[in-house]
């Protein structure tokens, strides 16, 4: 980990110093590196540790995640990430995702996924229906995030057996919010219907149910979270139809089971009030091009951040790295048009030409863009989040 920190964080550290940024680097570290030019290994490691903590804080993390080796990334979250990349690469007016998914993501900059607690008890079932209770621990959702929508995803398997009638090919799945748990064994819980779906047996697929009202009640209104009741009604009571075609529990033969990939999943879409939503198009301004530009003048330089070099690839699922770029170069008098200067920078440079006590304008980022990251948080929950101001799109003298 120490070697990884030195390989990339030192590079980031010096480039941020060169670019004139003041937000990421601790002031103590700045003085040590700028005044002495060289520090002891202990001082260097302490500053780099502070820098890593600052970066983690920028990602909204209190500590470095250390996920276990058996953590499973839901395929749906990977699909969301790749669909988002396809959306960014698509031409204006085209979309790579369905309407429901795009509508949910258009109001959120964070997507979180939760697997249910498998220790929850099963509600006794009857010949006509299969009923089970699901509980999801949502304590990892920060208080400052506003949940804009939520969906419960349940996998159902294709039924191959012959049917006595067309009606026996259908099942109805009802999703209930448990408003009040059962007070006694003889009485069931108080529930409220959230969503319902009439499903056909002809294919294996995921079914998505809108559970936004329940999540909003639990989080926004600070009301108790007692979980959901999933009810599968077997229409026509055909004895040939397997009652377990909707996967709501683990198989008794886990060695032959793909349960981790198809277990029920709760997905929340939220916004922390920072930056743009995941699928809101951002128009980028065209960068100024100049045929003859001095190599020493202010311009954008390549900088690739490889998360494996820092040892963060165990909790950052995607991307493996990204092109951050940085700004560096001179802002000479007089400032040329291609240096994208402000009026204040022009005046400051003019004053510097006659009074060197006034510093020159600095070469800094003038336009930044966001990246999306899929990662595991401190609680091993999979998160897809849009991070603002991560990529330098343009530089100028300011």
Swiss-Prot record:
Propeptide intervals in chain numbering: 24-284
Cleaved signal peptide residues: 1-23
Pfam family, one: TGF_beta
SMART domains associated with the record: TGFB
Entry keyword annotation includes Electron transport: no
GO cellular component: extracellular space
Glycosylation sites noted in the Swiss-Prot or TrEMBL record: 137, 202, 340
InterPro entries, per the entry: BMP2_TGF_beta-like (IPR047953), Cystine-knot_cytokine (IPR029034), TGF-b_C (IPR001839), TGF-b_propeptide (IPR001111), TGF-beta-rel (IPR015615), TGFb_CS (IPR017948)
UniProt KW keywords: Chondrogenesis, Cleavage on pair of basic residues, Cytokine, Developmental protein, Differentiation, Disulfide bond, Glycoprotein, Growth factor, Osteogenesis, Secreted, Signal
Predominant location category: secreted
Cystine pairings recorded for this chain: 298-363, 327-395, 331-397
SUPFAM superfamilies for this protein: Cystine-knot cytokines (SSF57501)
Function: Induces cartilage and bone formation.
PANTHER family in UniProt: BONE MORPHOGENETIC PROTEIN 2, TGF-BETA FAMILY
Subunit structure: Homodimer; disulfide-linked.
Family (UniProt): Belongs to the TGF-beta family.
Name used for this protein in its record: Bone morphogenetic protein 2-A
């Amino acid at each position: 980990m120490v070697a990884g920190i030195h390989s990339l964080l030192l590079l980031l550290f010096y480039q941020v110093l060169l670019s004139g940024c003041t937000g990421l680097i601790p002031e103590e570290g700045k003085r040590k590196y700028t005044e002495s030019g060289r520090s002891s290994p202990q001082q260097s490691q302490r500053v780099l540790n502070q820098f890593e903590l600052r970066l983690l804080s920028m990602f909204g993390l209190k500590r470095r995640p250390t996920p276990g080796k058996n953590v499973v990334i839901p395929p749906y979250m990977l699909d969301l990430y790749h669909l988002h990349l396809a959306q960014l690469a698509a031409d204006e007016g085209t979309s790579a995702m369905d309407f429901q998914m795009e509508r949910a993501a258009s109001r959120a900059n964070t997507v979180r996924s939760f697997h249910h607690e498998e220790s929850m008890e099963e509600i006794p079932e009857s010949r006509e229906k299969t009923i089970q209770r699901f509980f999801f621990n949502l304590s990892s959702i920060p208080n400052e995030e506003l949940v804009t929508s939520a969906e419960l995803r349940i996998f159902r398997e294709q039924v191959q057996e012959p049917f006595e009638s067309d009606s026996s090919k259908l099942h109805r799945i009802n999703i209930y919010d448990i408003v009040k748990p059962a007070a006694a064994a003889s009485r069931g819980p108080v529930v409220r219907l959230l969503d319902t779906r009439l499903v056909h047996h002809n294919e294996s697929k995921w079914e998505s149910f809108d559970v936004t009202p329940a999540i909003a009640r639990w989080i926004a209104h600070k009301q108790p979270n007692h979980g959901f009741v999933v009810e599968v009604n077997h229409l026509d009571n055909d004895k040939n139809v397997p009652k377990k075609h909707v996967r709501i529990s683990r198989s008794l033969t886990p060695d032959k089971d793909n349960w981790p990939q198809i277990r029920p999943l709760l997905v929340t879409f939220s916004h922390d009030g920072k930056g743009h939503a995941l699928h809101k198009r951002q128009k980028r301004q065209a960068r100024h091009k100049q045929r003859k530009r001095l190599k020493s003048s202010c311009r954008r330089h390549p900088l690739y951040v490889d998360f494996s070099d820092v040892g963060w690839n165990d909790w950052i699922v995607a991307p493996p790295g990204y092109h951050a770029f940085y700004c560096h170069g001179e802002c000479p008098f007089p400032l040329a048009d291609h240096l994208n200067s402000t009026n204040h920078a022009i005046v400051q440079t003019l004053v510097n030409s006659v009074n060197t006590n006034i510093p020159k304008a600095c070469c800094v980022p003038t336009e930044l863009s966001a990246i999306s990251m899929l990662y595991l948080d401190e609680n091993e929950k999979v998160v897809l989040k849009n991070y603002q101001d991560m990529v330098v799109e343009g530089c100028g003298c300011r």
